[in-house]
Amino acid sequence: MTERTSVRVHPTAEVSPDAVIGPGSSIWNQAQVRERARIGADCIIGKNVYVDTDVVIGDRVKVQNNVSLFHGVTVEDGVFIGPHVCFTNDRVPRAVNPDGSIKTDDDWEVSLTLVRHGAALGANSTILPGITIGPWAMVGSGSVVTRDVDAHELVAGNPARRLGSACPCGQPLRDADGEPFHGRCPRCGATFPPETPE
């Protein structure tokens, strides 16, 4: 690892000189950070992570190995992104136009995706384009997220469906008989649903 103004970059990582990396962040082996990407302070960007052009990542974000964050993705502070998570950004993916010509940037419309603060995305989950994942939401491993996920919502499956709520401490709070969880978190004692809005 090399030290550049308190940013650690592994020698095999490829970081564009046009990217902005916050202090205390680490970029691990074989990661690629493209032009105009912005990574906040105290982040961990794991092995073989791809951070596309103009992607924005907040402070204290953990991006585990083999994650792909494509153009149009914004990740707020304190988010956990598990191994092999893939963000998509094109609702109508095609390599060529109907006339057979190769698609260019002019033929393509990026869908924006937002992951709000404190959310957690389990390993191997896929996030379809144009999705917002709410604050402190939790996406189970292997899920395919096809719709917005509310604050504190726990979802899993293909397509991802509501299973309950997620406490900021990480404790899953399962719905009972189709009703959202109400009460105290058994791990940290927080009241649910939260008494103050996010």
Regions found by a protein language model. Name each.
Residues 175-176, 193-197:
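Short, non-ligating residues that shape and space the ligands of small metal-coordination modules
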Residues 1-4, 196-198:
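Basic/polar N-terminal segments that are highly enriched at the extreme N-terminus
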Residues 2-11, 16-19, 26-132, 164, ...:
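Flexible, glycine/small-residue-enriched loop-and-beta-strand segment within the central core
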Residues 162-165, 183:
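Cys/His-enriched microdomains
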Residues 167, 185-188:
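Short cysteine-rich clusters marking metal-coordination/redox-active sites
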Residues 147-148:
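Loop-to-transmembrane alpha-helix entry segments
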Residues 151-158, 166-178:
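Short, intrinsically disordered, charge-biased short linear motifs at domain edges
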Residues 135-138, 144:
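Internal alpha/beta core interface subdomains
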